[in-house]
From Swiss-Prot:
It is found in: Cell membrane. One of its GO terms (cellular component) is plasma membrane. In the C-terminal section; belongs to the protein kinase superfamily. Ser/Thr protein kinase family. Residues 344-625 form the Protein kinase domain. One of its GO terms (molecular function) is protein serine kinase activity. SUPFAM superfamilies: Concanavalin A-like lectins/glucanases (SSF49899), Protein kinase-like (PK-like) (SSF56112). Residues 649-674 are annotated as: Disordered. ATP binds at L350, G351, R352, G353, G354, F355, G356, E357, V358, K372. The lineage of its organism: Eukaryota, Viridiplantae, Streptophyta, Embryophyta, Tracheophyta. Glycans are attached at N124, N181, N185, N204, N225. Its EC number is 2.7.11.1. The active site is at D468. Keywords: ATP-binding, Cell membrane, Glycoprotein, Kinase, Lectin, Membrane, Nucleotide-binding, Receptor, Serine/threonine-protein kinase, Signal, Transferase, Transmembrane, Transmembrane helix. This is Probable L-type lectin-domain containing receptor kinase I.5.
Length: 674
């Protein structure tokens, strides 16, 4: 069914655009803009009827639309092109009109430094006239700017690296019938044709109403060498538009372009979309609104006052039920947390961890905490949730982020932990703005997290499976000690028993291959820790798609380096020469051992601690040992992903913003039913 719909759509929209390329020329035509061959930014948008709208009905806007791929103007022959487009500039009722529209040729489509208003969305005050701009444009301008030597508010101009046109003229076209130039109002809201032809170092610009033929005499004709403007011949072509205090709707209806002397593909006016006409408000409606406004305002004021009263009354309200009495010593008041975070103000926002937002809070006696706000529902699930929060508070280890307690409101749970001033480890590994961690600092962090996992698996009152070990869940305290946090996926079970998990969770790249079929165990935590070891030593994420294929999967790449007797080639290049080769090799080999796809071949965390401390040598294995260096990513259909509160998932707040939230390349935790 979906394939049939796609074919119907493809056939019905094929008439909108046609591309033609050869080794000698490139041409295309848009009869309406119903395809995705354009790169849009700013306020530019495609309307359902095929219109390309460059500027919206707001002040100080700019929009750009360019062909996605640059056009290769052959360097073996003089630069040449012809283009024909139809546009309409429709002033917003009550305004005189915006700052017009430009046809642009540029080596880049990055106009983030450009300004709206008189700079047309392609120039700015600091780059005017700079040859480094490499910019050519034909402007249809409807605002007079005396600073730019413009004589009226209805003109056509040729711009080269500068909004001050090298040549301009009032908008008009040569009428064959009248044998003279006839004025044309660019802001009439009616479709206008524009032709720009450049051949033999002569640039011709013509305009005409939609119903007229191409004028036999151009409006502007200038001898110029465009090849001197552009340092390269791969150039983008497209359009820009801008508004200032005056506002217009800027529309493009169709566009034809060719690098040949003649347009090989002509516009079909019968296929062009219609230009909408903005409606002015009726005077009676305006009068009625003026009469009703005081009444409406009074009602709004009363509603606001009532809302403020209700809000203040409920501001510090909490939810407390009889079953929570036994947890009273672990509970914070909502008022204290509200004041500590300044009302959860955006200035106190640290980031988003698993299942909630994290804020910094300053409690009395100079106690700084991190407060995570987690949504919840269901009384039974909440009982289990709070019970596990309190159980987690009983865990005491120098390399765990300490959980201090909780607070509960209707539909919301607040978790309080110690604040970690140096943020998350992944920020220091992957953010170029953060200081580079030395090898000695990294090695101490690795040994600390290994010790914390050994404690969770062996020494705690119950076995704790973390299930989401990665650099973004390791926080750094004031002394840069590693603290394992964000226990949003954690599970508890008695020693000697098995975890009764009903869902496989984790982050892609860190999940053991057997997780879906066999469920979580301490040995799946070991696998994730192995990936974490490689992540820290190599300064790379477990899966990266923007690199060479052989380096895409970290586990496989490290193993391949070992096979070539060049294991140290995989280390983080930011370490420079300040590292201990034996320690780096130990960490990488241990990472490969922990990520063995044969679960029984992985070491326990007690052995890992001994390996890292040097009290136990690594077992005899090589990069060719069965299960070493194999990466089998856990893949799941998106439809089966769930995040279940009632399955007792909870998240202790990380004490600073995690770069998992700030990096688009970093995978988010996944949970799906096994």
């Amino acid at each position: 069914m979906s394939k049939g719909l796609f074919l119907i759509w493809l056939i019905s929209s094929f008439h909108l655009i046609s591309f033609s390329t050869s080794s000698k020329d490139t041409s295309f035509v848009f009869n309406g803009f119903g395809q995705s061959n354009l790169a849009l930014d700013g306020s530019a948008t495609l309307l359902p009827n095929g219109l390309l709208q460059l500027a919206k009905d707001s002040q100080h806007q700019m929009g750009h639309a360019f062909i996605k791929k640059p056009i290769d103007f052959s360097s073996s022959k003089p630069l040449s092109f012809s283009t024909h487009f139809v546009c309409a500039l429709v002033p917003k009722p009550g305004f005189e009109g915006g700052h017009g529209i430009t046809f642009v040729i540029s080596p880049t489509v990055d106009f983030t430094r450009a300004q709206p208003t008189r700079y047309m969305g392609i120039f700015n005050a600091s780059t005017n006239g700079s040859p480094s701009s490499h910019l050519f444009a034909v402007e249809l301008d409807t605002v007079r700017n005396p600073d730019f030597r413009e004589t009226n508010n209805n003109h056509i101009g040729i711009d080269v690296n500068n909004p001050i046109s090298v040549e301009s003229a009032p908008a008009s076209y040569f009428s064959k019938t009248a044998q003279k130039n006839v004025s044309i109002n660019l802001s009439s809201g009616k479709p206008i044709q524009v032709w720009v032809d450049y051949h033999g170092n002569v640039l011709n610009v013509s305009v005409a109403p939609l119903e007229a033929e191409k004028p036999s005499l151009p409006l502007l004709s200038r001898s110029m060498n465009l090849s001197e403007i552009f340092s390269r011949r791969r150039l983008f072509v497209g359009f820009a538009a801008a508004t200032g205090t005056s506002i217009s709707y800027h529309y493009l209806l169709g566009w034809s372009f060719s690098t040949n002397r003649e347009l090989s593909q002509l516009l079909d006016f019968s296929k062009l979309p219609q230009v909408p006409r903005p409606r002015a408000e009726h005077k009676k409606v305006q009068f009625a609104l003026i009469i009703a406004l005081p009444v409406i305002l009074a009602i709004v004021v009363m509603a606001v006052l009532a809302g403020v009263y209700y809000h203040r009354k409920k501001k510090y309200a909490e939810v407390s039920e009889p079953w929570e009495k036994k947890y009273g010593t672990h509970r914070f008041s909502y008022k204290s947390l509200y004041i500590a975070t300044k009302g959860f103000h955006k200035d106190r926002f640290l980031g988003r961890g698993g299942f909630g937002e994290v804020y910094r809070g300053d409690l009395p006696l100079n106690k700084t905490v991190a407060v995570k706000r987690v949504s919840h529902d269901g009384e039974q699930g909440m009982k289990q949730f709070v019970a596990e929060v309190v159980s987690m508070k009983s865990l005491k280890h120098r390399n765990l982020v300490p959980l201090l307690g909780y607070c509960r409101r209707k539909g919301e749970l607040l978790l309080v932990s110690e604040y970690m001033p140096n943020g998350s480890l992944d920020q220091h590994l992957f953010d170029d703005q953060s200081p580079v961690l030395s090898w000695s600092q990294r090695f101490v962090i690795l040994k600390g997290i290994a010790s914390a996992l050994f404690y969770l698996h062996t020494e705690a009152e119950q076995v704790v499976l973390h299930r989401d070990i990665k650099a973004s869940n390791v926080m750094l305290d004031a002394e840069l000690n590693g603290r394992l946090g964000d226990f949003g996926m954690a599970r508890f079970h008695d020693h000697g028993g098995n975890a009764a998990t009903t869902a496989a969770v984790g982050t892609v790249g860190y999940m053991a291959p057997e997780l879906i079929t066999m469920g979580a165990s301490t040995i799946t935590d070991v696998y994730a820790f192995g990936v974490f070891l490689l992540e820290v030593a190599c300064g790379r994420k477990p899966v990266e798609f923007g690199v060479q294929v052989e380096k895409r999967f970290l586990i496989k790449w490290v193993c391949e380096c070992w096979k070539k007797d060049s294991l140290l080639d995989a280390k983080d290049p930011r370490l420079g020469e300040e590292f201990v080769p034996e320690e780096v090799e130990l960490v990488m080999k241990l990472g490969l051992l922990c990520t063995n796809i044969v679960p029984e071949s992985r070491p326990a965390m007690g052995q890992v601690v001994l390996y890292l401390s040097g009290n136990l040598p690594l077992p005899d294995f090589s990069p060719y040992t069965l299960g070493i260096g194999s990466f089998t990513p856990v893949v799941v259909d998106a439809a089966s992903l769930t995040v279940s509160f009632t399955s007792r998932n909870w998240s202790a707040p990380s004490a600073s913003s995690s770069s998992a939230n700030n990096s688009k390349d970093h995978e988010q935790p996944l949970e799906f039913k096994s």
